[in-house]
Amino acid sequence: MARLRRRLWAWLLAGFLTIAALTLYQAERTGRSEPVAGSCPESALECPGEEKPLPLPVPVEPSASPSASASPSPSATPASPSPTPPPGSSAPPPSSAPGPACNATSPGACGFPDSRSTGPRIALKRHDTGNMSIKTDGTVIKGWDIYGSLDVYADNVTIIDSRITSTNWWGVNLRPGFKGLRVLHTTITAVPGKGPDNGGVNYAVSNMGESSVEVGWCDVSVFGNALSMGQGDLHDNYVHDIVAFRNLGGEWQHTDAVISGGGNKGRLTVRHNTLLNSVPIDKGASAALGLFADTGVVSNVIVDNNWLAGGAYALYGGGPGATGILVTDNVFSTQYHPKSGLYGAVAAWNAGGAGNVWRGNRMSDGRPVVPEPSP
């Protein structure tokens, strides 16, 4: 009898322990027995039970490959560039609606290139090259602090993340018959009074040939006709502090931040640059951007989303006979003159030219810019 009682108590105890174990197991699974969690540490990348915040947009710095065969990152462009109307069609009339105003003296604050977004991004090593000729295809110059100039007799030459201080006619020059020159993230300047044109210097980048030259994210100063070419891709550059000089003929040299003389064999694209010409009119200032029919008819040019200031007129638009000229969404700053240029924002605009488009251009205070009728 005693043995039976002991067995009964043993079974009861075993059952009780089994029930308790099952209860604890269930509590562990449901979390009811977990202690209250402490606050998530600030160093944690993500806290349990919290929704991830949406990522903030991060600006991506454009970069270029140091290899001559790789293409550099393209410049930021509008999502839908303006289409070119077919020849003979009527371009839409210029908009008269005001645009947003911006500080006339701060292109960088308004989203345009300045000293902070242009020039080399790496440490430089000094190279006293003098006036050096490049004759090897695919040459890459990177991280050089050059005292001299570069005369290019080769294809697919890349100059990137460098600085050029010239006392020659140019900083970089592409000779006829060669192609593929790219000048990126480079400061190009000169020593005033030390150039060959009676102390003056003329071209930061010159294209003597018929192929396109790319100049992007460059900080350019001093040169009288800073970026000079018939065809090319000029984007995200900061051209400023042009220095006036009397040339070998004894006359004040005409100055322009960008100049093209017409007769071009390919497209010239001038997009998202800051182009400043602070030279006084009586000392030679022509334009911030001059499209002149000096050597032939001006055609096939895109002028889009630039900041322009200075000159007699800030923009010369190609003159009679100019065709395929798209001038869109540019800001004409009053930094030097109330009208952007001394006499106005634009001259020599051929409104009736086939494929010519004028749209979305405004003063820095938001007023629309409408060209004067052609004479």
Give the role of each language-model region.
Residues 3-27, 79:
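Secretory targeting and sorting signals
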Residues 22-120:
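N-terminal low-complexity, Pro/Thr-rich disordered segments
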Residues 90, 294-297:
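Short, electropositive alpha-helical surface patch
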Residues 97-128, 323-324, 328, 334-375:
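Acidic, glycine- and Ser/Thr-rich low-complexity intrinsically disordered tracts
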Residues 106-189:
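N-terminal carbohydrate-binding/catalytic regions of secreted carbohydrate-active enzymes
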Residues 111-118, 201-212:
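Short, basic/low-complexity N-terminal boundary segments at the transition from targeting/disordered tails
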Residues 126-129, 146-148, 166-175, 192-207, ...:
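Extracellular beta-strand/beta-solenoid scaffold signature
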Residues 138-145, 156-166, 178-192, 209-222, ...:
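Right-handed parallel beta-helix
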